[in-house]
Amino acid sequence: MKNNTFFKENIVPALVLVIICLVVTAALAFTYGVASPIIAENEKQTADAARAQVLPAGDGFTLYEGELAEGVAECYLADNGEGIAVTSTYGSFGGTLTAMVGVDKEGKVTGVTVTGHADTPGLGTKAMEADYLAGNYTGLDSAAAGSIKDDANVDAITGATISSNAVYQCVKEALAQYENIEGNGGLN
């Protein structure tokens, strides 16, 4: 009798818990299997929309499989040969800043958007506002200076020089990526 009580009080609850865990794990795995392709497609559409925002003339994008410039995380070629959309990173005040930069087939910046940063809201993030980015970088075809303070063509945000420089360096990396592609046969 004592053995039967031990089984009912200790083993049965443990077995029930194991069965519940197996059922929940199977349900979670099934849900992940069903949702994973949908999530991947949504992420691709979101990324393509961001690429289209920085390179409006681009019509569809294909991942560039060649060599990437330093600081470039990924590069996509516009399917119609109108340019590239580059995601680049650089150290900023609060951590790593990530920006997406569009460069047209003439080597000019068509758009910049900051896609990730850890800078303090307020002054530092002014260097990431759409008006600042468009006014300073659209049409830029060269960013050869060592930092933003040495480039007369681009204005830094006073008090946010580190954040401004991080954006500048991301644009510089994107333009370097364009030059790499042009040096290896061009966009087509």
List where the protein language model places each region.
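Flexible, solvent-exposed loop/hinge segments and secondary-structure transition points
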Residues: 2-188
